[in-house]
């Protein structure tokens, strides 16, 4: 019997907490976000707490992730982006660990929920907007009118650019949530047929599952990278008005 592949995304209360009429219960989603944060902090503390001239494997892996983030900022924002390394690095690591936690058997994929990814996207959107106005003042609004636009086309271009700008949180959040959900649904559906397929195809389904799991891990890493690099592109608009 095929189990509902959407059950794995159910949010369950672990500790029921209510303050007046507000439900602020501690859920499996909150637990996995907390666990991912603690694990990430522990990982990078161990990687960088005692740096060596001849680095350990843990230090090398931590440096690779750090250099990846700094390269993203340098390539998309330039030297002015260095001050945003802590924010972008935290964003990338949090999404990466949450994505990878979903690959653990009986784990929970936090980033498959649009409310989580939308909250992250809104934070990026607010940061970009605030940085833009703080750095450029009202001149930041020139972002919505590309240089060289004919005067008669200006009203239409402003509307299009404004709509595109406001749609950024939706596109960022939907891309991440949809990709994580689709991949896990596919794995769940195929895994439910593995036992049946083994009767007819012997051990062939096992390598297939290994390949699919490997591909899903790749997607988890890729989606964290895409979310972060798009955040850098948006940040470039605020810093350099490009």
UniProtKB/Swiss-Prot annotation:
GO terms for cellular component: plasma membrane; proton-transporting ATP synthase complex. The chain crosses the membrane at residues 29-49, 84-104, 114-134, 140-160, 189-209, 210-230. The keyword Cell membrane applies. Keywords: ATP synthesis, Cell inner membrane, Cell membrane, CF(0), Hydrogen ion transport, Ion transport, Membrane, Transmembrane, Transmembrane helix, Transport. It is found in: Cell inner membrane. It is a multi-pass membrane protein. InterPro entries: ATP_synth_F0_asu, ATP_synth_F0_asu_AS, ATP_synth_F0_asu_bact/mt, F0_ATP_A_sf. One of its GO terms (molecular function) is proton-transporting ATP synthase activity, rotational mechanism. The keyword Membrane applies. F-type ATPases have 2 components, CF(1) - the catalytic core - and CF(0) - the membrane proton channel. CF(1) has five subunits: alpha(3), beta(3), gamma(1), delta(1), epsilon(1). CF(0) has three main subunits: a(1), b(2) and c(9-12). The alpha and beta chains form an alternating ring which encloses part of the gamma chain. CF(1) is attached to CF(0) by a central stalk formed by the gamma and epsilon chains, while a peripheral stalk is formed by the delta and b chains. Key component of the proton channel; it plays a direct role in the translocation of protons across the membrane. Belongs to the ATPase A chain family. This is ATP synthase subunit a. It comes from Rickettsia bellii (strain RML369-C). The gene is atpB.
């Amino acid at each position: 019997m095929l189990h509902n592949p959407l059950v794995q995304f159910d949010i369950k209360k672990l500790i029921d907490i209510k303050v007046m009429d507000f439900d602020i219960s501690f859920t499996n989603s909150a637990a996995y976000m907390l666990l991912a944060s603690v694990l990430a902090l522990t990982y990078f503390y161990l990687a960088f707490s005692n740096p060596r001239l001849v680095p350990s494997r843990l230090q090398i892996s931590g440096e690779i992730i750090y250099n990846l983030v700094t390269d993203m900022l340098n390539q998309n924002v330039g030297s002015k982006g260095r001050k945003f390394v802590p924010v972008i690095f935290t964003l990338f690591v949090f999404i990466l660990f949450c994505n990878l936690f979903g690959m653990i058997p009986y784990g929970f994929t936090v980033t498959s929920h649009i409310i989580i990814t939308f909250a992250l996207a809104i934070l990026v959107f607010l940061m970009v907007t605030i940085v833009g106005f703080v750095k450029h003042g009202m001149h930041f609004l020139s972002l919505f009118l590309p240089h060289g636009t004919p005067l008669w086309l200006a009203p239409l271009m402003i509307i299009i650019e404004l709509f595109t700008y406001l749609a950024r949180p939706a596109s960022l959040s939907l891309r991440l949530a949809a990709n994580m959900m689709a991949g896990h649904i596919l794995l769940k559906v195929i895994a439910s047929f593995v036992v049946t397929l083994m009767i007819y195809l012997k051990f062939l389904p096992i390598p297939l599952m290994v390949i699919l799991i490997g591909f899903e891990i790749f997607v988890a890493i890729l989606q964290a990278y895409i979310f972060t690099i798009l955040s850098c592109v948006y940040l470039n608009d605020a810093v350099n008005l490009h």
